[in-house]
Amino acid sequence: DHNIPPDIEKGSNKNIGLFHGPVTGLYTDIGYKFEDEFDVDKFNGCDVVLCGDIHKRQVFDIPDGKKAYMIGSTIQQNFGETLSKHGYGVYNVEEDQYDFIDLPNPKPFLKFEISSIDDLETGKEKLLNY
C-alpha cells in the first residue's frame, strides 16, 4: 500500500510528478517487460512525470495526453545494458520540453560477436550492445 498516489488538485501551476520504481509497460535493455508494476493511471493530475529506476531511457504516455520520462542510468552499468543512450535529462517548465543529454562512458562494457580470428584481422567483428 506504499504506492498509493495522492489526490492532485489542478491549479494554475504545473504539477510535476517525481517517481522512483518500475512502471507497467516499460522495458529493460534486455527486453524484459514490466507487466504488474506501478500503473500509469496513478499519475492522473500530473502535467509531466520524471521517473528513475529502470536503466533504459524511455518516454511514455500518462493520463490526459501528457508525457512521462524514465531517465535511465547516467552510464552503462553492465553488459546487459546498451552502451549508448545514457546520461541525464533537462525539463524546461515554461516550454514543456524535455531533452535527454548523453554522457560519454570512459569505461564501457563492450560485447562483441567474433566468429573466428579472421573476423578480428579483417575488421568484421560486430559490436552487439551499441
What are these regions (language model features)?
Residues 68-130:
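Binuclear metal-dependent phosphoesterase catalytic core
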